Amino acid sequence: MINLKVNFSNLVKQLIISFILFSSVNVFSEENKILELIEKNWNETQTISGRFFQILDNDKKISGNFYIEKPYKSSFTYDNKLENIITSKFFINIVDQERYLIDKYPIINQPIYKLMSEKISFREIFKILSINQANDEIVIKLLSKNDSSNIGTQINLTFSNSNYSLKNWEIIDELGQSTYLEFTKVRKNISIEPVLFVVKVR
């Protein structure tokens, strides 16, 4: 009788463990599928343009137009602001309204550099913290890895659940400072004037 109880107890434990393992495999498989679809859509997109909104530390929202051309080229032109941003393969360039260089910073060790590469594999260059679906959005939380200068830098990406377009990104550095950009009126794989990525030097 004792052996019967012990065997039954072991059987129940095995069933519970099997259920947990099966559920975990299903969740992991679903996450992989979502990640693959987003990667496919992102890698098939060579150019992007639209409007962006940036939230500052004081909760003030500023806006402008953005243009991205892979690999590494982007232009963020702010509304009613004297300075804009143009990125290249090596630098984040701060420019005036006529695109003359004001200052520049290395881009290679920044998360945006990885996101704007020709092809991306999230699991290769980031640690996946979580993948969540809610309503019509997919939120992927990433952590930079294999990069000593970005230890602790977290990247939160929100995609549309219908067409896997990027809706917003938030980059949180190791000091807890957040850079949040929301994207609207997005157009993909369009022709972009090369002059938008030109940085002039006086």
Feature map (PLM): residue ranges:
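Bacterial N-terminal signal peptides that target proteins for export
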Residues: 3-15
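N-terminal signal peptide c-region/cleavage motif recognized by signal peptidases
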Residues: 24-25
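Cleaved targeting-peptide boundary
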Residues: 28-36
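A short, Trp-centered hydrophobic/proline-enriched beta-strand micro-motif
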Residues: 40-59
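Short, hydrophobic/aromatic-rich segments at coil-to-beta transitions
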Residues: 47-51, 71-75, 91, 134-141, ...
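A generic structural motif
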Residues: 53-55, 77-79, 95-97, 143-145, ...
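An acidic-aromatic
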Residues: 66-114
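Gly/Pro-enriched, hydrophobic low-complexity segments
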Residues: 124-202
